[in-house]
Amino acid sequence: MQDASNSIDISLAGLDTAEWKDKLIAQAQENGLYEPLGKNHFATFIDEKSTLLVTFETVQGIRTLSENAQPFGFDMVKAQGWSHLCIISDGDTWFRDSRVYGFFDHLIDDGFFEEFDKVVFYGAGPCGYAAAAYSVAAPGATVVAVQPQATLDARMTEWDDRFTHMRRTSFTNRFGYAPDMLDAADRAYVIYDPRQTLDAMHSALFARANVSRLRMPGMGDALQTRLVEMNILYRILSLAGVGKLSEQAFYRMYRARRDNVSYLRRMRSRLDGDERPYLNMLACRNVTSRMHAPQFRRRLVALEKQAEAGDFRPPPALL
């Protein structure tokens, strides 16, 4: 008999870290399994239907980004009835750990991934790297990686100075160079902002026949958060789970950026920085006509005063 107090429907929000981990482990054990993977990693598995979502997440990300302080994949379990394997790290480790290698070796040897009709790997940033790298364990999988690094091997990516503390970590042994690990995937989708130079350079390393590089220009360096805000990340994974994710489908969903305040603010700031008052006025008019946006209203008023002073020729007034 299942213990209702350990249902994944029970929120873990508000707990301290130790109690949170204990409750998460209990939920995993009640509905599947829990596997410790050394000091900095552990795995949870929820056993449901024949579609498996494999996510790579961090303790900090789960506790910060999830309203229920649960792994991202739990929402897909609840909504879609999917099975879910979550590999969790304490901090950003890029999952470069022999215990994690061994765990995936064990899954491969047991034919674990072969038990599922569809397997989807997902992660963002360092977790996106891991989603791509470990997807080789499940040939034919679909991979969705948001802002992934291809490798942090300094011989290949010495231009990336963001993660110099990882320079002593090997990215050349097991499950190492993420783009090569995608060769066994059915399809992979790498989501990035081309205006984030280092992210774009990593994205270029993923160029493969089976990889679609999906651009989110102007969205900044927190794409997973923006995707959640726009309510399209779950839709992306849902389409991936039924083999219907495509570039066209992604860009249709991405139209939601027009209502994303973070994106609109970045656009306004960019137009200010580029000294494009004409376009900025058009943008501010559009935003204030559709939503309550005091900052855009104030900027529009300021631009109108500049235009009246003859600083620039304004666009025609809206009818």
Regions found by a protein language model. Name each.
Residues 1-110, 114, 140-319:
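Extended, composition-driven regions rather than compact fold-specific motifs
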Residues 123-135:
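Glycine-rich nucleophile elbow surrounding the catalytic serine of serine-hydrolase chemistry
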Residues 115-125:
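Alpha/beta-hydrolase fold nucleophile elbow
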